[in-house]
Amino acid sequence: MVETHCHAQRHAVRIGEGEGDYANLADAMKTAVMADDADEDTDVVVYDNSERLLYDMDTYDVDMCVLLSAFGMTNELNRQMIEANPEKFVAAAAPVQTKKRALRGEEAWSWEAAADELDEWLSKDGFVMTGEGIRGDPTRTEPVPWRERKKHLRHVFDVAADHGVPVRWHTGYTSGYGGNHLFHLYPDWQDPTLASQLKAEYPEVPIVFDHGGMQAGWREDYVDKVTQVAGTFDDVYLEIGLYWGELMKKPINDPNIAIDQLLWGSDWGASMVQHSQPNEYPPTYWEQISSKGLPAHQPDYWGANQRQLLKFALDTDL
């Protein structure tokens, strides 16, 4: 069993009174510093949480995890985890330092620099794809027209084609973050069917839809769109680890989507909680719930998601 969507780094944050909500912390985490490089003035650090991850892997019989960086998590720390446990971990490469330099005002964002950073990390052992998702200039606040955005995405697809690796394409979103959501800025985050254009242009590059269109909440429109693309290309893959049992039927019952296009990718290490509403549809789903605040514990993604797989298996007599 392989978990294809795992955040094995964790943040420690110094916050003031009233600052501990999703919106404030999301911005603070983007420039996080590795714990070993921090000093007394550092407000946010990321640290290796792989000991907890390995414990969960043993508990739930998970054989390998794909490590992803997000919110200031670094390629460097993922590489250290791979070197310590090469039989357990591989990782996706992201232009983390290019983004941080832009956020700190040290160097303007450029897609050429982002592509160079991706190329550097994909040249190292253990880095097997790009992602999570395809971001962009972190200082931008106005929407990007698709014609312009498509040119940007080609930088990532060119590097992926050179290295023979998949590109991860983000689909779905959580509630709770303040300011401009990425799906407001980027048309490809708004409409996953645009991936078909890049897939046709780069037939040799597989695409993995992060979250399979269902990162959080109960809205299924992104799921419908990603299954449309996966039904057209046999090397487009869907992560269904956050699906509830009934939702799994959509891709599994589609005769144009093969079972090997479905990946068990949840969001291990993220801050969503499982919302339960018995006798409603869906009976349970993942979400960030602002009124309840940040969870005081690390949510158990695998136990809950394996139960949904078991529910589907029992319902369909597998």
Predicted feature residues:
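Well-ordered, non-membrane alpha-helical segments in soluble/globular domains
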Residues: 46-52, 74-76, 108-116, 149-153, ...
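Active-site gating/metal-coordination segments in enzymes
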Residues: 64, 72-178, 236-237
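Histidine-centered divalent metal-coordination motifs
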Residues: 5-11, 170, 211
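Acidic-and-aromatic substrate-binding clefts and catalytic sites of carbohydrate-active enzymes
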Residues: 43-47, 67-76, 98-112, 138-147, ...
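Catalytic pocket-lining loop regions of alpha/beta-barrel enzymes
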Residues: 143-264
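Active-site neighborhood of phospho(di)ester-bond hydrolases with catalytic His/Asp-centered motifs
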Residues: 2-4, 67-68, 92-94, 131, ...
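Mid-to-C-terminal alpha-helical segments outside catalytic/metal-binding sites
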Residues: 2-4, 11-64, 256-261, 271-318
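Conserved, mostly hydrophobic/aromatic
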Residues: 5, 57, 121, 160, ...
